[in-house]
C-alpha cells in the first residue's frame, strides 16, 4: 500500500542520481560506458566550488564562538512552540525532530561509508524528496530561525542531529553525549541508492537477500517498508529485511531492537487522508513542487492539510499512551496486547489490539479528550516473533534501565557512525567512553621522534635489506584503506599488521609478513635504545619506510627529494579492531597497483580506479601522477608487469607516460588473458609491453590524456617527481585528524 500511496503522490517517476559506489555490481550510471568515456566526476570537488563560504572559512574555528548552552535552550524552547502552519503533534515537535535526525543519519551504509548525517545531504535532492522523508521539509523549516540566529557557527548537519538528541533529553531519555563537527555540503551527491534508481519504491531485494552495497530494502526508504516486504504484511519476511538492512549500516540485533523499540516510544505516524482521496489531495515532493511553495512539498488539500489531516507514510496512529515521554510502554504493548491486522484510513497495512484497555488508549494528537487504539507496524511485530529479536525485546521488557542504556548507546552510534574517529569530534558534550565502531587508536604516551631520530630510523630502514618496492607497497597498502566517505581507514593504527588486513589477498600476506617483521625489529631496537621516553610506532615506521623507498627511487633516477614526514601515528590493538567491520574496507580492485580480485569485469576497472581515487580524496592530476609513478616504481600486485612501461623499473621517473604516448607502439587486446593488452612495436611486430585497461585509460580518455601529456613533456620531469611526492604525502596523511593540515 505504501508503494501505491507513493505512486499516487506522483513520485514514482522521480529520477535519482546514479552510482558513485565502489562495488562494481551496483554501478548504474556507467554501466553502458566504454573505458574511454570513464566518468571522472567523482574526482571533481564541486561542493567546494559551489560553497558560498569564504575561502578561509573554517567550521572548527567558527564553532568556537557558538554558545552551545544557549543553542540547546533555544532548541528546547522550540519543541513546544507549535506553529499554525504546521502544528506540533501532542503540542511537542520532539518526536518530529527525532524522526528528522534518524532519517538523516539512517542512510549510512557500512559497505562504502556513504550516506549518514555528516554534510547534511537530507537538504538536497534526492533525499529531500524520498517518500520515507515525507514532511521532513517542514521539520527543517522549523529549525531555520535557530540556524539563522547562529549562522556559520553551527552547520545544518550538526543542527539536524542535535535537534533529535535534544528532543530525546527533553522527553526523559538522557543521551550519552553529542559531538559537533559535521560540515555541510552544498549540493546533492551522486550516490547510487537502489538497483532501479529510476523507480521510487522499487525493491533492492533479490531472492530474499538485500543486494550488496545497499542499506534499504526499497528505493526511497531509509531501512524497510513498515507494512512488510514490498508492502505485504509478512512478519517473518519483515524480520529478515530488518536484520539485513540494519546490518548493512553496521548495527547488531541488539542495537536494532533498541533503536526501533526506543524510537517508536515517541510520536505517531500519519495516514489520515482516505485512500480514494490521496491521489487528488497530495501534491508532489519538494523537488517537483511548484515554485511558489518555496521548497516545501507534499502539499495536502484534504481538510486542514495538517494536524489531524496530515498525510505521511499512510500508516496512522501512535504506539503508546505517552507519545512524548520515554518509557517502555512500546514493549509492554507489544507483549501484552493481541494484535489484529487492519488498514489505516489511507489503506496501509497496520495492526491494532483486540483487547485494548482504557489505560492502553492513546490520546489524539490535536483533539483533547479524544482517544484511539494504539497501533503496531508489521515490522514492530517482527521484534516479537523473530527468535533473534525476541531475545532482546524480552530482555529490555524485563530490564527497563538496560533498555534505556542500550538505546542511548545505539542512538549515539546511529548519529555519529559516519563522523569517523573521535579525534574529529568537537564541542563540550563528547562522551569519555570509546566505542569499537569509532576505530579507536591509543593516545601516544611517549615522546615523539626528533629530526635526528628520523634520520637514524631512515638509515636503519635503508640498511635493513628491504627493497624500495617492499617498502613502498607496504606503505601504500596501509594508507590506501582510507575512505573519505566516513573517514575510516588510513595509516594511523597500523592495522595492516592486524586481522583482517594482514590476511587480505591484495596485501600479499606472506610478503607483507617479511616487511612487518623487519620493521618491528627496527622499532624494538630503536625503542629499547632510547632512555628519554622517545618511541616510534609501527604505523609511523611503515609510512617512513614508504618515504625512504620513494626517496631512494627518485635518487636512482637522478632526482634528490626529501619526503615530508609527520610522526604521531599510534598502533591499534587487535581488541580495538572490529574484524567484520574492517573487512568492508577491503576493495575489489586497486588500479594504483593493478590489483583485482576477479569480481570486477575488465571494462569496469578504469571506473573502479576512479572510485578508489575518490575515496582517497584525490583529484584528476593526483590520481594520474600516482598511477604513473607507481608503475615506474614497479610495485604492482604480485609483481605483475602490466603497465610497467619502463626500461628502468624501480626508478621514479615519467617513463610510464612517455612510453604510453609513444606512437611507435600499437596496442592490441591479448588473445590469452581477458583484460590484458599487448604493446607491439609497429616496425618489428615484436611485443614491447603489456598493460591493463587502467593503464591504457590514460591514453584513451581525452581528459586523462591531457594530463598524461603534461607529465610526458620535455622539461616536466622534475615536476612529475615533485607532484608524485606531494600526492604520495597526501595519501600517507589521510586520516591524520590528530594534526592540523
From Swiss-Prot:
Disulfide bonds: none annotated. There is a cross-link at residues 223-249 (Tryptophyl-tyrosyl-methioninium (Tyr-Met) (with W-102)). Pfam families: peroxidase. Its cofactor is heme b. Keywords: Heme, Hydrogen peroxide, Iron, Metal-binding, Oxidoreductase, Periplasm, Peroxidase, Secreted, Signal. It is found in: Secreted; Periplasm. GO terms for molecular function: catalase activity; heme binding; metal ion binding. Binds 1 heme b (iron(II)-protoporphyrin IX) group per dimer. There is a cross-link at residues 102-223 (Tryptophyl-tyrosyl-methioninium (Trp-Tyr) (with M-249)). It comes from the Bacteria. Its EC number is 1.11.1.21. Formation of the three residue Trp-Tyr-Met cross-link is important for the catalase, but not the peroxidase activity of the enzyme. It catalyses: H2O2 + AH2 = A + 2 H2O; 2 H2O2 = O2 + 2 H2O. Heme b binds at residue 264. Homodimer or homotetramer. NCBIfam families: cat_per_HPI, PRK15061.1. Bifunctional enzyme with both catalase and broad-spectrum peroxidase activity. Belongs to the peroxidase family. Peroxidase/catalase subfamily. This is Catalase-peroxidase. It comes from Francisella tularensis subsp. tularensis (strain SCHU S4 / Schu 4).
